[in-house]
Structure formats: C-alpha cells, structure tokens
Curated annotation (Swiss-Prot):
Record PROSITE patterns: RIBOSOMAL_L15E
SMART domains from the UniProt entry: Ribosomal_L15e
Protein name (database record): Large ribosomal subunit protein eL15
Keywords, in A-Z order: Ribonucleoprotein, Ribosomal protein
Pfam families, A to Z: Ribosomal_L15e
Entry's Gene Ontology molecular function annotations: RNA binding; structural constituent of ribosome
NCBIfam families linked to this entry: PRK04243.1 (NF003269)
C-alpha cells in the first residue's frame, strides 16, 4: 500500500530530536526563543497534526505559536515569619496543563477568535511551544463550511475558558477511554486521601479515628 505525505511527516515527528530533525529543531528553537511569547505564523509547523485537528488552508483559520514557561507555579516568597515548610512556594503545580494555558493566552491575545485545538511543536530546558488553531466565527467562509460552522453558534463562545477544548476536557477527566484515572484531579484526590490516612500528630483528635471513618470523610 502506498503511503501518503502525512504519514511520513507523522513518522518524523515521533522522534523530533533524532537524526536529521535534530539540526532542524535546534535552529528552530534558537529562532523561537528570540520571538515574542505569542506570535502569529502563516503556516502550521506540523501540517499532519493541524489537518487532523480540523485546520484548513482557507480564510478564517489562523495559526498562533505560544511559548509557555515549564515547571510549576512561581510563588513569591513571604517576608513574614513561618516555617520553610509552610512558605507555600515549592511543590505547587497548576491544575491546568501547559497546553491549556497556551490556548487561554492565545484566546486572550485574539479575543474575537475561538480556539479550535492545539498541538505540541517543541521544547527546551526552560520553555514549551504549542501551536494553537484559532477560528474566526464571524467570517463567511467559516459560517458556510459544513465541517466547522458549529463553532459560529453562541454556545461555543469563549469555549477555551470553560474547559471545552481537548486539553480542557483532559484536565477535567472527561476522556471516555480513561475517565478520571491518572488525571491531575485524580492525583489530587488520591493525595488528599493519603493525607487524611497519615497519622502525623498522634495527639490530635482525628489521629485516633478508625481508618474506615477517615476513608469515608475523604470520599465526601
């Protein structure tokens, strides 16, 4: 069976930092680091992924590349006295994924457009880059396209801020195949349950409760 162009593009992007792609990605990252955090580009870097997510080379579709800083939250260190453990500056990660953060920043930059989807394009030691597909819901070419005209309806306004994109649904644990397991919310609930079960202060009233009661409180 003859394989098309998109198949070979996808194969290259499975290992973007190996072989001939390594030199190309190095040149791209050097250039991208000097650019603004949010920049509009003419064509998608990953054509196969963009087309799979609904992109079309026609009026009304816009591609934006967004740079997001890697890592957890950058909390300001308190200047009042407390234990270092209670400072609240380390170990706090956002509940949103970096991809969803990139989508929201692109939507704020272009408030008249709607976010269709996004995909990963690269990273270095400090940043990650995503390309966000934006759609103009008021453009005639979009409103008359049977594949994408659903986004022109009023219930899809500001959809990225309501967790209705693919990244937003993943963050909310709405994947049909996996459900809540292994999502950020699942890990948070599991950690809360571990904290309640752990007897850190034997003198406290809750430390001597049976584990069945503690587990029931955690589920509530």
């Amino acid at each position: 069976m003859v394989k098309g162009m998109y198949h070979y593009i996808a194969q290259l992007w499975k290992r973007p930092y190996e072989g001939d792609m390594l030199t190309l990605m190095r040149q791209r990252l050097i250039k991208w680091r000097r650019e603004p955090a949010i920049i509009r580009i003419e064509k998608p870097t990953r054509l196969d992924r963009a087309r799979a997510l609904g992109y079309k080379a026609k009026q009304g579709f816009i591609i934006v590349r967004v740079r997001v800083r890697k890592g957890g939250l950058r909390k300001q260190r308190p200047n009042k006295g407390r234990r270092p453990k209670r400072m609240g500056i380390y170990g706090f990660a956002p509940s949103k994924s970096l991809r969803l953060i990139a989508e929201e920043r692109a939507a704020r930059k272009y408030p008249n457009l709607e976010v269709l989807n996004s995909y990963y394009v690269g990273e270095d030691g400090n940043y990650k880059w995503y390309e966000v597909i934006l759609v103009d819901p008021h453009h005639p070419a979009i409103c008359n396209d049977p594949d994408i005209k659903w986004i022109c309806e009023k219930q899809h306004r500001r959809r990225v801020f309501r967790g209705l994109t693919s990244a937003g649904k993943k963050m909310r644990g709405l994947r049909k195949s996996r459900g809540l397991k292994y999502t950020i919310k699942y890990k948070w609930k599991r950690k809360q349950k571990e904290r309640l079960l752990k007897k850190r202060h034997e003198a406290s009233r809750g430390a001597r409760e049976p584990w069945q009661i503690v587990l029931k409180k955690a589920e509530e």
